């Protein structure tokens, strides 16, 4: 079973996403609400994936992405955020994001991204980031 942590500053949004993922058979280990939570939860739980919002107060998603990948360069971080400009997408992929999923999105599309990257990970394949 694929395990994730959900990092989203909107508490209701985090809960809805977590519940939808659980319904689809994804193991949601924990929820966090800023980039610092992302780093602390990743170090503690070592999930298969981090689903990371970008626009959050205090410590944003860029902070979380950088710090998680400094700790574990093989970490799989999927950015799930609204209003990501093209230059930000390039910055995120250069920083090491495994995928960028723009809100709003279909849940099946997000699950497909998780499954694709998980297969690549299991088969030790290195691929380019997925952007949808």
Model-identified regions with their sequence ranges:
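Alpha4 helix (beta4-alpha4-beta5 surface) of REC/receiver domains from two-component response regulators
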Residues: 15, 63, 84-101
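Receiver (REC) domain active-site loop signature in two-component systems and cognate sites
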Residues: 56
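CheY-like receiver
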Residues: 119-132
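Active-site beta3 strand of CheY-like receiver
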Residues: 45-51
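C-terminal output helix
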Residues: 87, 105-115, 122
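Two-component/phosphorelay signaling modules centered on CheY-like receiver
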Residues: 10-30
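Acidic catalytic/metal-coordinating carboxylates
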Residues: 34-37, 60-63
